[in-house]
Amino acid sequence: MSAQPISDFHAYPDAAGHFGKFGGRFVAETLIAPLQELSAAYDLARQDPAFIAEYDKDLKHYVGRPSPIYHAERLSREVGGAQILLKREDLNHTGAHKINNTIGQALLASRMGKTRIIAETGAGQHGVASATVAARLGLECVVYMGATDIERQKINVYRMQLLGAKVIPVTSGSATLKDALNEAMRDWVSNVQDTFYIIGTVAGPDPYPRMVRDFNAIVGREARAQMLEDYGRLPDAISACVGGGSNAIGLFHAFLNDPGVKIYGAEAAGDGIASGRHAASIAAGRPGVLHGNRTYVICDDDGQIIETHSVSAGLDYPGVGPEHAFLSDSGRAVYQGITDDEALAAFHLLAHTEGILAALESSHAVAQSIKLAREMPKDALVLCNLSGRGDKDVHTIAAREGMVL
């Protein structure tokens, strides 16, 4: 916990990219100049009315924003307790929140004169969103993806290829998201003159955590305005899944200075925290440096990263965005572990009661929202970020339940 209460959470990060003791820029000398170039370009763009107007236009006419808030009435009745509301990011073009960020970064890449974009992906949604905007803007696109994730997300791999992207399997380490990010960083160092690296989450060295947050903050700004317009008040609690944490910080940011709104993040507890097979960096990690920033990481006593596990490829990451680490330490947000089984149960319950197939990532937040709702009065409001749709996960769920499709 922080020694003194924080009056303005929107004042972070500081000029050096720090969220309290987290964040920063811990990278090899070869990346300092590219990061400085990127930071300067972003700081100019974010203050340019023409850039903002182009971004807003694409969000409306290409992505399909605003995404609605849906009252899950039958789910709420089934669960008992508070009313569960869903922020429907699954209805965006490409089926998740990821395109909010890739649109912004791709426009910035074009503004900087870059002709090639690279990306890492876990569940494949960020890869699809990157390939999508690359096709629209006429940019070459290369996506790095762990071989393990390629096996469990074959549909998204083919979607990327249909969009013209080259998907490169990564077989090092655990062959998942962290390894894909490592390979993408290596590519960027070697090809920085013409290449822009679109990181998909609020991790990495500064300016990535704040830049990805800013491009996703539309989620929370919309949600806050929609709550006031449709319900006449703010929600009592908000919930989102947290791997790196881009969808979560996108929702959380607009509510950080609203003390009456409780904030909850759902981490991937996998087979249970005690089992050691999980990806709950805040619940079971310790401070360390990963992918260029200081945050909570899952590591051994020697500081070596431990292999993580989650049924959800998008949450299978041994770190968390530095702003989430900061929000946890400050006490502003509470992060809880949701197991694979709890997420799958929530997936099925939402499908049966509301006719919505949520992504496995999002199903962790649905499970958390169900737990919260059960402990709250009937007139309370819980807003859950439904960050993506579950079409991509149907084969994974079927295989886990013994079905061959």
From Swiss-Prot:
One of its GO terms (molecular function) is tryptophan synthase activity. The modification N6-(pyridoxal phosphate)lysine is found at residue 98. It is an enzyme of class 4 (lyase). GO terms for cellular component: cytoplasm. Its EC number is 4.2.1.20. It catalyses: (1S,2R)-1-C-(indol-3-yl)glycerol 3-phosphate + L-serine = D-glyceraldehyde 3-phosphate + L-tryptophan + H2O. InterPro entries: Trp_synth_b_CS (IPR006653), Trp_synth_beta (IPR006654), Trp_synth_beta/beta-like (IPR023026), TrpB-like_PALP (IPR001926), TrpB-like_PALP_sf (IPR036052). GO terms for biological process: L-tryptophan biosynthetic process. The beta subunit is responsible for the synthesis of L-tryptophan from indole and L-serine. Belongs to the TrpB family. This is Tryptophan synthase beta chain. It comes from Xanthomonas campestris pv. campestris (strain ATCC 33913 / DSM 3586 / NCPPB 528 / LMG 568 / P 25). The lineage of its organism: Bacteria, Pseudomonadati, Pseudomonadota, Gammaproteobacteria, Lysobacterales.
